[in-house]
Amino acid sequence: MSNSNQPLLSKPKSLKHKNLCLVLSFVAILGSVAFFTAQLISVNTNNNDDSLLTTSQICHGAHDQDSCQALLSEFTTLSLSKLNRLDLLHVFLKNSVWRLESTMTMVSEARIRSNGVRDKAGFADCEEMMDVSKDRMMSSMEELRGGNYNLESYSNVHTWLSSVLTNYMTCLESISDVSVNSKQIVKPQLEDLVSRARVALAIFVSVLPARDDLKMIISNRFPSWLTALDRKLLESSPKTLKVTANVVVAKDGTGKFKTVNEAVAAAPENSNTRYVIYVKKGVYKETIDIGKKKKNLMLVGDGKDATIITGSLNVIDGSTTFRSATVAANGDGFMAQDIWFQNTAGPAKHQAVALRVSADQTVINRCRIDAYQDTLYTHTLRQFYRDSYITGTVDFIFGNSAVVFQNCDIVARNPGAGQKNMLTAQGREDQNQNTAISIQKCKITASSDLAPVKGSVKTFLGRPWKLYSRTVIMQSFIDNHIDPAGWFPWDGEFALSTLYYGEYANTGPGADTSKRVNWKGFKVIKDSKEAEQFTVAKLIQGGLWLKPTGVTFQEWL
């Protein structure tokens, strides 16, 4: 760690450089406001669409209505009382991209000039988060271009804009422990980006057609966004899948590569077709970061107890939570089957992630994911887990994706001294995000080391990591290691009235809801239509992308 009194720019000319940056930024902001206001005037004078709302109407559902209206006022003039919402969103996103690029430069300079491993790691996280956020905003503008919108388009944009806000918040979390001088230069710009991401979501939600806000389409066994080929792959016999793999990884030299990292590096970038890496039985001590350009990559092993990818990065030893993952997937369309993802850092090392997924339309099938605190980081976007075995202690399924778990074993372990087990810590930051954790037809049990001492160790279904945390447990078996209260607060009254925690049609000795918490945000779901909002079909639009993968899934209840 660098000294907290160490200035970011240590040379005498640094103050001039800093002041010059601030002046240039101010001038550029003024210029951008004028430019984008002019663009908006042009758009509105040529468009008499009936999708017009005042700024107060657009901001009605915003996290902070005053902030929303203040930011939108940059794009209005006294002669304009109404705005075309889609045009406004497009212009607003263009402006946000410009501001993001400016902030990226500042963050990059802060990383270069910072001292200490933790500082550099935090800023590196931010650079990555802003880079992918730019991509998501550009994709959103392209998706809505031309006026040919459908439910898939709306679902895509809602998911992508939700991820942008989460990325910015992840960035702020990663730099929370960096030196004060380094942080104070970039934090105001990052907080401005957060505000703009919230406004973009508010504008978009005001555009949404009348429909369920968690519209998802999944049928049969997998989400519908899986292609026919992907579905065939997941339904293929292990032998067939291994024979047809593009490359083989084997520690004994019988494959093309000896490490998974080598195989990932050799995989094509931005591939439109599935690229399969077969990883033979063995223990692979590697930290693997699958970049955003490694799209449609699939890792296949010899079984969730045979092919093991293991690491031990953790927060106590200097990593950020984001960077501690043994395997991190950032390329859209990521799939994994018959693999064991492991982080062996142990409970004393605090946050230590086994698998982090920041990739859209991800499928994890028949895998094992083992660690203690923060085992599985379902960071952003749409994810589906089937027939997998997940273990941990504190907040061991966490993040802010739209994620469904089906037919999984969710197993609490014996934690460190004085710790309580929390199965989930969902991180929804804004009421307009379409994110949630849905656990359907799973088994929630205690591990062999926890079962004998479960009377002395408190285990809960989850706690609210963020203000609008949203988690549903439905049609699952809940064993008696779960505390009768069911859920646990994060910090006092925080989020207890704004969260959404639901339980529906569960079984087992721990499923009794008579002694559950009486928070405003908790409810025992009685109506199947309400529960359906958290199915594969509605939460992750599974019907659009899971079918082609071949993975088994249940579309509805």
UniProtKB/Swiss-Prot annotation:
Family listed: In the N-terminal section; belongs to the PMEI family.
Chain positions covered by the region annotation Pectinesterase 18: 246-543
GO biological process, one term: response to bacterium
Sorted UniProt keywords: Antimicrobial, Aspartyl esterase, Cell wall, Cell wall biogenesis/degradation, Fungicide, Hydrolase, Plant defense, Protein synthesis inhibitor, Secreted, Signal, Toxin
Region (Pectinesterase inhibitor 18): 47-203
Tissue: Expressed in siliques, flowers, floral stems, rosette leaves and roots.
Signal peptide residues on this chain, from the entry's feature table: 1-34
Protein name: Pectinesterase/pectinesterase inhibitor 18
Coiled coil: none
UniProt main location, coarse: secreted
UniProt subcellular location: Secreted, Cell wall
Site description Transition state stabilizer, residues in chain: Q373
Enzyme kind, highest EC tier: hydrolase
UniProt superkingdom: Eukaryota
Note, other: The PMEI region may act as an autoinhibitory domain and prevent untimely PME activity during transport.
Active site positions, chain numbering: D374, D395
Residues that, per the record, bind substrate: T321, Q351, R463, W465
Pathway assignment: Glycan metabolism; pectin degradation; 2-dehydro-3-deoxy-D-gluconate from pectin: step 1/5
Single annotated GO MF: enzyme inhibitor activity
Disulfide cross-links: none
Enzyme Commission identifier(s): 3.1.1.11, 3.2.2.22
Reaction(s) catalysed (UniProt annotation): [(1->4)-alpha-D-galacturonosyl methyl ester](n) + n H2O = [(1->4)-alpha-D-galacturonosyl](n) + n methanol + n H(+); Endohydrolysis of the N-glycosidic bond at one specific adenosine on the 28S rRNA
GO cellular component, one term: extracellular region
Function statement: Acts in the modification of cell walls via demethylesterification of cell wall pectin. Inhibits the elongation phase of protein synthesis.
Source lineage: Eukaryota, Viridiplantae, Streptophyta, Embryophyta, Tracheophyta
